[in-house]
Design a protein with these regions (language model features):
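Transmembrane beta-strands of outer-membrane beta-barrel pores
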Residues: 120-124, 180-186, 197-199, 217-223, ...
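Outer-membrane beta-barrel "beta-signal"
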Residues: 195, 403-417
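Transmembrane beta-strands of outer-membrane beta-barrel proteins
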Residues: 114-118, 174-176, 193, 208-217, ...
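Transmembrane beta-barrel domains of Gram-negative outer membranes and organellar outer membranes
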Residues: 27-203
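Short loop/turn motifs that connect adjacent beta-strands in outer-membrane beta-barrel proteins
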Residues: 104-112, 173, 200-213, 244-251, ...
């Protein structure tokens, strides 16, 4: 048995190593992230450091910080802002696709048990939503527009995730697992850890007519992405009942519930990658300029001056005539932190013959996703309606699309006991 255990362990290690060392030709894949397209801007001609924005001139179609924003009398190279609305829906649906896999009944492997398996999960996506059309690269032939104003004609309908899952039985009904996941057509990887505790298992007489019951905690975190941090935490409760067919085949249906918490954060994103903040503004300094708001506005500075971070000497503007304070240092940003929850139902069936195991599982949202920590309204999109004098410009609260996701998983593996 020790030799058998070492063999799948070595195979699993070699498999993970080969996946991590796969050669890449440097080209972006369709599902790679393109967060610099999730931006918006206001093309009001730049006066007084942009304080007097016309609310009707907010543009929510990417392409900020470029000469293209000067079309129709607008301000060229308009300042960039992070689009947290589309970001929220991207984090939500990507988090479900990378959620920890289960594909196992409530009964654990036992103290000497060991499992290694390959899992393929398919999750539906809201392909027509701008979160996917702008937030992922797409193929060259599927793009409409250019640069950061580009969008896919349609996003992917499903996310396909391959997963290598290894589990080891522990004393007292515990089981420890680890998994490595890869989102197909992308360079997105995730690693995870899960711990399961079977509170009631193994009885075959008397109370053995009752199903086995187990709870599990799991976590998956995305790796290798500098601009995005994504962690998915799962809490599961599972019921299952094993049946023996012909003395050799074990058939185990299982049913359970899952609570998912998706934690999405971003690093600093450059929304105008074709420009250089250092070349345009090698040295920044605070300057005081006249506050252009009318004297009757309660928000006007009492001194009549406002401090702005502007460029010192030595910078080179992106285009002749461009205001010096409209430089590329304004075109980087961080998306708001997203804390999202899902309540899911899981149903599946496992078939085991000797050491060979095949499992099928279907998980689905029982209700629409929601925030367990609501983002600040200040992070929402600005309203295109005029603001009331003396009050901040109104913003639209960030919401999640009323879209329920499902995941179908097929797993094949070897179980040693």
């Amino acid at each position: 048995m020790r030799a058998l255990v070492r063999t799948p362990l070595a195979a699993a290690s070699l498999f993970a190593l080969s996946l991590s060392l796969q050669a890449r030709d440097g080209r972006a894949d369709p599902m790679d992230l393109s967060l610099n397209r999730l931006s918006y801007y206001n093309d009001t001609p730049w006066v007084g450091g942009g304080v007097n924005y016309d609310p009707a001139r907010w543009r929510f179609n990417g392409g900020c910080g470029t000469s293209a924003t000067g079309a129709a009398g607008g301000q060229p190279f308009a300042q960039c802002y992070a689009d947290n609305q589309r970001w929220a829906n991207l984090v939500n649906q990507l988090g479900v696709a990378l959620a920890p896999g289960l594909s196992a009944p409530a009964m654990t492997l036992g103290f000497s048990g060991f499992y290694v398996g390959y899992e393929m999960a398919v999750t539906n996506l809201q392909s027509e939503d701008d979160a996917w059309r702008r937030g992922t690269q797409g193929g060259l032939t599927s793009l409409v527009g250019t640069g950061t104003a580009a969008s896919r004609d349609r996003g992917d309908t499903n996310a396909f995730v391959s997963r290598l899952h290894v589990r080891k039985g522990l004393p007292l009904g515990f089981e420890l697992g680890t998994q490595v996941s890869h989102l197909h057509s992308s360079n997105i990887w995730a690693i995870g850890l899960d711990l399961r505790w079977s509170l009631f298992e193994g009885f075959r007489r008397g109370i053995g007519y009752l199903p086995d019951f187990a709870i599990r905690g799991s976590v998956n975190t995305m790796v290798g992405q500098q601009q995005m941090s994504l962690t998915v935490v799962g809490l599961d409760a599972m019921l299952s009942k094993r049946f023996t067919l012909g003395g050799q085949v074990r058939l185990t249906p299982f049913l359970g519930g899952q609570y998912l918490m998706i934690l999405g954060d971003s690093g600093v994103v450059d929304f105008s990658p074709t420009r250089s903040a250092f070349n345009e503004c090698p040295r920044q300094e605070i300057r005081y300029v006249a506050d252009p708001r009318p004297p009757a506005d309660p928000l006007r500075s009492p001194s009549g001056l406002i401090g702005q971070l502007q460029c010192g000497t030595g910078g080179q503007v992106a285009a002749p005539g461009l205001p010096g304070d409209l430089n590329d240092t304004r075109n980087s940003g961080v998306f708001a932190a997203m804390r999202i929850q899902h309540a899911r139902m899981i149903a599946g069936l496992q078939l085991q013959w000797e050491i060979f195991t095949v499992s099928g599982e279907f998980a689905f949202d029982m209700m629409p996703p929601s925030f367990f920590r609501t983002p600040s309204t200040d992070a929402g999109l600005p309203s295109t309606s005029p603001a009331v004098m003396g009050q901040p410009a109104p913003r639209t609260p960030i919401t999640l699309n009323d879209y329920r996701q499902w995941t179908t998983t097929i797993a094949v593996g070897l179980t040693f006991q």
